């Protein structure tokens, strides 16, 4: 982090550099997540689900223990569990992340199948004063929508959610800010007039 702090100081008269991290949220690491020292001059912490009770949906064997639909249900239940014990984050990242990895010909994912649970998740995020991320990597992977899908983004807005950040999960420079050009219209269609950035862990709202 010191490296980025030095960059921030060196270029402060030219560009704004914000320093952030992504924390994987899970009950088994909740103490570590909650004790992470945000006094290290971080601007932003994304909390995300990459594992489901310690198992990775990226791998095919993850899907062999139960039906695909039940597996997705377990994923969303794990998010609610994470929210009950992990508190040191600003937005929840790529909320329907698991949709990227559902095996072909196993289950045609429909978020409506989990509508009530997703609604509870979004209400909990809002009540905790957190936000969500709209992540364009879904488009990079050939999905028709970002993560989460726009219906979930709209539900979040309609429930009173205001904090929404934009991320690309680039991993490679060529995917930096991938398809950000279309995100503004997506957010407007979902009811938002602003997107959010964070400075010293405080949200700042930027008009679309």
Q: Where in this protein do the model-derived segments appear?
A:
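Divalent metal-binding pocket/active-site signature
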Residues: 40-125, 131-146
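Secondary-structure boundary/capping signal
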Residues: 15, 44, 90, 164, ...
């Amino acid at each position: 982090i010191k490296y980025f702090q030095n960059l921030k100081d060196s270029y402060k008269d030219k560009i704004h550099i914000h320093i952030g991290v992504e924390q994987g949220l899970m009950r088994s690491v909740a103490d570590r997540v909650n004790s992470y020292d945000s006094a290290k001059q971080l601007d932003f912490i994304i909390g995300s689900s990459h594992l489901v009770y310690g198992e990775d949906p990226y791998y095919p064997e993850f899907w062999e223990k139960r039906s695909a639909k039940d597996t997705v249900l377990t994923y969303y239940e794990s998010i609610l569990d994470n929210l009950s014990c992990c508190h040191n984050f600003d937005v929840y990242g790529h909320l329907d992340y698991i949709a990227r990895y559902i095996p072909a010909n196993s289950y045609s994912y429909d978020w409506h199948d989990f509508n009530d649970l997703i609604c509870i998740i979004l209400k909990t995020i809002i009540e905790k004063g957190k936000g969500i991320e709209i992540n364009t990597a879904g488009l990079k992977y050939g999905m028709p929508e970002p993560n989460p899908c726009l219906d979930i983004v709209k539900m979040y807005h309609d429930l009173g959610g205001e904090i929404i950040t934009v991320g690309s999960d680039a991993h490679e420079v060529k995917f930096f800010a991938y398809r950000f050009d279309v995100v503004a219209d997506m957010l407007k269609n979902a009811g938002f007039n602003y997107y959010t950035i964070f400075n010293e862990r405080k949200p700042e709202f930027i008009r679309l």
